[in-house]
Structure formats: structure tokens, C-alpha cells
């Protein structure tokens, strides 16, 4: 994306990744799917150690985007949109959440989380809760959602590699909004190449 970088060089934010997956779902042209995944997996190429924020001006590389928090918000936005798009694509629509308009300035990613979606036929709302889930494999991402009636926590695991991956997952009961006394949920999971799994935990 050239954006408004001018002398700073191309902008390295790959906000178009989810859009490319949508194009792939419509055209079945694998170049869109492959470009989306290559762009997303390269997101950690130049990350500032102090702030944890990726650079997106070509001339800065791993110096980071700066101390302004809105730089991180943009990156959270496109990554989350991409993960939701991958989940929808891999599940053939069994995982689906409504999206808002495309955001201006940075790219083509869209907002989510303002309305319930569907996970495996059940209405659910996206949740982002610090320390709720941990996985011991950096090649696996996850999305969390809670059923509308509050009875089920969904953890959607996504393998980001073209090979099988194994992982150990922990869901910490202390981060669950449940009236029941629960133990931490642990599970060993095997994921196929670019595969996904829906883990359902009763609350």
C-alpha cells in the first residue's frame, strides 16, 4: 500500500489481507489467498522491541511506528479482521461475524464485534480477554467467542502453516465470567495444514 507515505516509502501494513481472502472466496484464484497469508505472516518482520509495534514506513524498518497508541490500534484492527476472514473461509461459513465499513486512512480492514455472529450454528459474541487463552505454538492463532446465552465458550484455533501443527492450550478459569467453580481447561490439539478447530467449553 503506497498510501500517503511519499518519501518514507511504501506503507508496510497489510490491511488488505482479509479483503484478499474475500476475493479468493469469490474467484477461487489462489493468488489472492496466498498473498493474504504471506502478508499476514510477514507482520512480525520489523517489530520494535520497546513498544512491540510493527513498523509500517519502509524507511524505518524495525525502529517501530512511534509511541502513539493509534499506530497499534490500526494493526490490531487489520490482524483481527484477517483472523475472522480466515475462520470464515476455512469453516465454509460455520464461523461468521458481521463487519462494519472499511476503515479510512490505513487500509481496507473492517470493524467487528458490534453484533453477534454464528459459531457452528450457535449465536455468539466475540470476546477479547487478556490471559484467557494461551497456546504454546506461535504458528497457531485463536479467536474467542461466547454463546449468546452464556453457556459455551468457543475457542477457534487457526494453523498458520502449510504443515501439521501440535499445541497445548490452556483456558484460565479465573478469566471466565462464570458463577460456577471451574478448573483451568487444558487440551492437546493437532491441526492440519492451514486447518482450524472449534473447541467448545461449557460454562
Give the ranges of each region predicted by the language model.
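Terminal, non-catalytic domain-edge segments
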Residues: 1-160, 195-198
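C-terminal beta-strand-rich structural cap/linker in extracellular carbohydrate-active enzymes
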Residues: 77-78, 183-203
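Intrinsic-disorder/low-complexity peptide segments enriched for small residues
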Residues: 124-126, 174, 189, 201
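Surface-exposed beta-strand/loop patches in extracellular or lumenal glycoproteins
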Residues: 158-174
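Short acidic, gly/pro-rich beta-turn/loop elements at beta-sheet edges
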Residues: 165-167, 179, 199
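Solvent-exposed beta-hairpin/edge-strand motifs
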Residues: 170-185
